[in-house]
């Protein structure tokens, strides 16, 4: 039996599918789900890229330990990573520095960000925030203050109010990289935190935590981070930044990350 689909119809249909596939997720009302690469800290870069590719991940935040400032990485590490990621069709949109403590750290962070081709830097700083604001405004980059939980320690950025107070005197260049898991660990409602930070939100770390005052990660939807409500709130905000799935665990995370990404995409 002859097919009723002509060549012209086939070409038009294929072109339409390709055009649709090329539209970023957030352009069609979908949240932009990617990965925070600290999740793969036990793997080599090459093995990590294999797993990212298998999951169909297109955007990441570079947060692997060897790239953080306190480990004194060299330029070649970033050049090589950029080459490998580009070859795999994976975009690095943010670089996690950890603490920027002085001018040299800031200069290194800017240089490394350029080598990776990112548009945002995530980290923490206190005295350096005005210099970060000025320097990154000049470079056309943004900075997201990262909230964190440390057991037995008081950290500068635990609550959304801590972050907002730090942002009060800074330009819109500086905002928040909101880690919903760390907010939950510190006893704060992640959804409320996202609402309060909405106008300054640069990036989201999507992780679920077993219990307040703890650091044990669980699969998304299994803990106290209110992940479905978090995603609803990001939809309400029409958030266009990266929603970076993070899962901190020793040992193999391949199956875990497959479940994590599938869960996040279902809510995206």
Language model features by range: what are they?
Residues 66-70, 151-154, 212-217:
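A short acidic, helix-capping loop that chelates divalent metal ions and anchors anionic groups
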Residues 39-41, 64-66, 98-101, 127, ...:
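Active-site-proximal loop/turn and secondary-structure-junction residues that shape catalytic pockets
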Residues 2-32, 37, 41-58, 164-178, ...:
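Histidine-acidic metal/acid-base catalytic patches
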Residues 15, 20, 47-49, 84, ...:
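Active-site acidic/histidine proton-transfer and metal-coordination neighborhood
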Residues 71-75, 103-109, 254:
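Metal-dependent catalytic neighborhoods of phosphoester/phosphodiester hydrolases
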Residues 62-80:
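Glycine-rich, proline-tolerant flexible connector loops at the mouths of alpha/beta enzymes
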Residues 61, 94, 122, 144, ...:
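Conserved beta-strand positions in the central sheet of alpha/beta enzyme cores
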